[in-house]
């Protein structure tokens, strides 16, 4: 039987065998008048064909899905189906972009919040001595004396950080919230203080690095967050004095004449450091993509971002319809991460069977690896962490008595009901 089919230009130049295979996969079960049913076995020859076609290769004329009803003729979608499938794909990619690249937007808003208070370069440090409820931080502790700043290695070149002795745990994270280095007790200075030399992605390592703890960051923008503690009387004065006396950041090129430091009290300021949970999330993310080196993200992640219009060197200008779709994707993502963060589905994160307390580091890894990496990355645990918490360091995961720190989280009472701020719990 001779079959006439509408062939797209994409088929030109294909061999007869290849063309036949493509047609077999694409054709619907009703390709010849719409009267025959799906073939029942892989050895059957459907009407209109000359060769057996397995059932699983056939496309029905109409398919009902959660994304809508898709209609096909000879395996080719009609205009409504094509548009719906493309819109659904963009929604999926926007949803995945929100979850997967959330760490970048989170740390970017930390940087922006600091900048709004005058912490605009490495010579300015925000002291939170201590922190009250005015500044919006995800996991700021009110009994910790923080020293916090951002530095840009593209502007400074190799940067020296002088850490004073006696500080608690400190951490450097890159612009994708990845771990770069620990300082203080869990770091190589072991709480005795020392000089750290941070190299950027474009920097060559100096010939002489004697006297420095050397680390390299894959990003230009980096966050230095340091912790000190209240004294026995609950006062921050001693910690503040230690910061002001010993904390220094300066380019290696200025080591012989370091610039003066400015310390800004930010513990009571009114400002925000939390990423948006609406369309503006993508604008925050675009700031990172435009500023940072191309290799901050691997090609797979860059492709995910560019599929919704976020590409280095190009303006992010979604249409009104695209903007609406991106907004919806964020809202669906927020619903998921709120649900799993408050009541994680992974039983392994709970400290005790049948209890509510859990760790934010699923898998016992600051990289959220499953079985040491055999199972890849625990995406739920990673998403939960960066939506609700900040600072990424192995010192918050590994059992380092007297040096690191461990965190437990609870969001529900003994019955599994969410905690209510208007109630008292024992």
PLM feature spans:
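Hydrophobic alpha-helical segments
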Residues: 17-18, 91
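Bacterial N-terminal signal peptides that target proteins for export
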Residues: 3-17
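Bacterial signal peptide processing site
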Residues: 28-31
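A compositional/structural signature for long, glycine/proline-rich flexible linkers
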Residues: 36-426
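C-terminal motif of bacterial Sec signal peptides marking the signal peptidase cleavage site
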Residues: 23-26
């Amino acid at each position: 039987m001779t079959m006439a089919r509408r062939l797209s230009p994409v088929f030109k130049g294909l061999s007869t065998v290849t063309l036949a295979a493509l047609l077999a996969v694409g054709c619907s079960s009703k390709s010849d008048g719409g009267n025959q049913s799906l073939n029942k076995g892989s050895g059957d020859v459907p009407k209109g064909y000359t060769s057996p076609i397995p059932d699983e290769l056939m496309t029905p004329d109409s398919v009902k899905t959660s994304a809508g009803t898709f209609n096909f003729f000879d395996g080719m979608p009609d205009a409504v189906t094509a548009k719906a499938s493309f819109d659904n794909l963009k929604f999926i990619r926007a949803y995945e972009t929100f979850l997967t690249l959330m760490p970048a937007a989170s740390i970017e808003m930390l940087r922006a919040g600091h900048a709004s208070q005058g912490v605009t370069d490495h010579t300015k440090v925000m002291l939170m001595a201590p922190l009250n409820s005015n500044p919006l931080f995800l996991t700021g502790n009110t009994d910790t004396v923080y020293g916090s700043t951002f530095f840009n290695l593209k502007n400074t070149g190799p940067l020296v950080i002088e850490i004073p002795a006696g500080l608690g745990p400190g951490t450097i994270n890159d612009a994708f919230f990845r771990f770069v280095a620990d300082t203080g007790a869990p770091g190589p200075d072991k709480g005795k203080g020392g000089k750290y030399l941070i190299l950027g992605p474009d920097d060559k390592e100096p010939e002489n690095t004697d006297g420095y703890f050397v680390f390299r960051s894959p990003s230009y923008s980096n966050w230095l967050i340091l912790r000190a503690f209240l004294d026995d009387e609950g006062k921050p004065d001693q910690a503040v004095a230690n910061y002001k006396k010993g904390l220094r950041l300066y380019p290696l090129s200025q080591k012989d004449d370091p610039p003066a430091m400015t310390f800004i009290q930010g513990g009571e300021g009114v400002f925000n450091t939390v990423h948006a949970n609406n369309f503006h999330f993508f604008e925050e993310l675009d700031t990172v993509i435009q500023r940072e080196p191309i290799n901050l993200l691997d090609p797979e992640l860059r492709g995910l971002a560019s599929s919704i219009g976020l590409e280095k060197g190009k303006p992010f200008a979604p249409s009104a319809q695209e903007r609406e779709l991106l907004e919806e994707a964020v809202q669906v993502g927020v619903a998921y991460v709120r649900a799993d963060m408050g009541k994680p589905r992974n039983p392994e994160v709970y400290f005790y069977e049948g209890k509510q307390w859990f760790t934010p580091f699923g898998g016992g890894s600051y990289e959220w690896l499953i079985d040491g990496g055999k199972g890849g990355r625990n995406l739920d645990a990673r998403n939960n962490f960066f939506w609700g918490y900040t600072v990424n360091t192995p010192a918050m995961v590994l059992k380092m008595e007297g040096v690191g720190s461990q965190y437990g989280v609870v969001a529900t009472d003994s019955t599994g009901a969410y905690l209510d701020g208007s109630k008292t719990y024992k």
